[in-house]
């Protein structure tokens, strides 16, 4: 059934345990579990879609050969995103220019603009515009988009937007995502049906409310305090603060329009999706639909694993030895391996084309 062999340590062979471990313990000593130093990033304010300012960081290694653009999940800010920083370290060490950014209404981007989230509907263009500016700064093509959790959904929208909006002189090659949100309606409904899910949903909702108050403090005219007070759930946040600005009558309509699952048939660039069957944040009923979508679209490579939790994928020593990985970060190792393979194939195909001329 599973398309890829991945094995975590025995005590993490449970989605809830893996997710909890990653959130509460792995973040404490992640730097000791990486072999590469932090790149020297330069802060940049990009201009995203609709002129929205986006805060980001850029690092370009000597003799960079291509670029990875990435962001994170539903809450947080760039400096807190240790999992994304692991990617930055690993990618930079392998010769990739790295662009990481606070997406709409998050981190320093929230200080630059009161523009709220749209779960990919507009963030997709943000990815493209960021790549366009990064290219002018010296980041080389091809560009690859990445993200995890809700950030994975945003990156998928970026891959879709690239096919429609990318300038011809910039090669946006595709994307690779980890545990992307694919169906918010089904997953939120599922999440609140069990104790762990209720706890996670409550924590996320509190962070979203903090985010709203942060924006209100800088842009008091941007939203009503009463609406923020009523936003006591993820659904409530979108209902009270988001959907009207985007022109949706209901949250369900909004989730349908931004659905990553509905987007998959429309992707026309190589896309890797890592997805764990035991992810406790997403409705398991999504998996058969994901498999069908991946089977029907030859541009999608699906790595569906039995274990992994939600954005966990800590590998056992046996698993590390099997893949000759330098560390326990199985998901990022597979992402970079897949991108490198895709990049090499494009170089080889390009050389063959030239030899025929």
Task: Report each predicted region and the residues it spans.
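Catalytic histidine neighborhood in serine/cysteine hydrolases
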Residues: 294-313
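Conserved alpha/beta-hydrolase "acid-adjacent" motif
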Residues: 280-286
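Short beta-strand/loop motif that positions the catalytic acidic residue
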Residues: 267, 273-275, 279
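N-terminal cap/lid segment of alpha/beta-hydrolase-fold proteins
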Residues: 20-63, 322
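Catalytic active-site module of serine/aspartate enzymes centered on a nucleophile-bearing elbow/loop
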Residues: 308, 315-357
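Short, surface-exposed "cap/lid" segments of acyl-processing enzymes
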Residues: 59-112
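Alpha/beta-hydrolase-fold enzymes
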Residues: 144-245
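Alpha/beta-hydrolase active-site loop
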Residues: 117-137
């Amino acid at each position: 059934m599973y398309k890829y062999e991945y094995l975590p340590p025995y005590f993490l062979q449970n989605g809830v345990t893996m997710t909890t471990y990653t959130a509460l313990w792995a973040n404490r000593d992640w730097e000791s579990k990486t072999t590469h130093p932090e790149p020297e990033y330069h802060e940049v304010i990009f201009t995203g879609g609709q002129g929205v300012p986006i805060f980001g960081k850029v690092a370009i290694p000597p003799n960079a050969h291509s670029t990875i653009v990435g962001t994170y999940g539903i809450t947080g800010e760039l400096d807190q995103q240790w999992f994304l920083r692991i990617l930055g370290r690993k990618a930079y060490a392998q010769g990739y220019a790295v662009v990481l950014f606070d997406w709409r209404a998050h981190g320093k981007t929230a200080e630059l603009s009161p523009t709220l989230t749209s779960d990919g509907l507009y963030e997709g263009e943000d990815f493209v515009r960021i790549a366009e500016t990064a290219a002018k700064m010296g980041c080389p093509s091809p560009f690859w988009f990445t993200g995890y959790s809700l950030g994975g959904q945003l990156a998928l929208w970026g891959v879709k937007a690239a096919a429609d909006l990318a300038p011809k002189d910039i090669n946006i090659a595709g994307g690779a995502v980890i545990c992307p949100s694919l169906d918010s309606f089904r997953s939120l409904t599922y999440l609140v049906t069990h104790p762990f899910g209720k706890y996670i949903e409550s924590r996320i909702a509190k962070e979203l409310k903090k985010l709203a108050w942060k924006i209100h403090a800088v842009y008091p005219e941007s939203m009503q305090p009463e609406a923020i007070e009523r936003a006591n759930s993820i659904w409530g946040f979108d209902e009270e603060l988001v959907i009207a600005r985007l022109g949706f009558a209901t949250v369900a309509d909004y989730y349908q329009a931004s659905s990553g699952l509905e987007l998959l048939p429309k992707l026309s660039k190589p896309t890797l999706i890592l997805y764990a069957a035991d992810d406790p944040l997403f409705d398991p009923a999504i998996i058969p639909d994901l498999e069908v979508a991946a089977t029907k679209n030859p541009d999608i490579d699906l790595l569906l694993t039995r274990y992994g939790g939600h954005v966990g994928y800590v590998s056992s020593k046996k698993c590390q030895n099997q893949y000759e990985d330098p560390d326990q970060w199985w998901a990022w190792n597979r992402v970079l391996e897949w991108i490198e393979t895709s990049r090499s194939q494009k170089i080889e195909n390009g050389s063959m084309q030239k030899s025929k001329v």
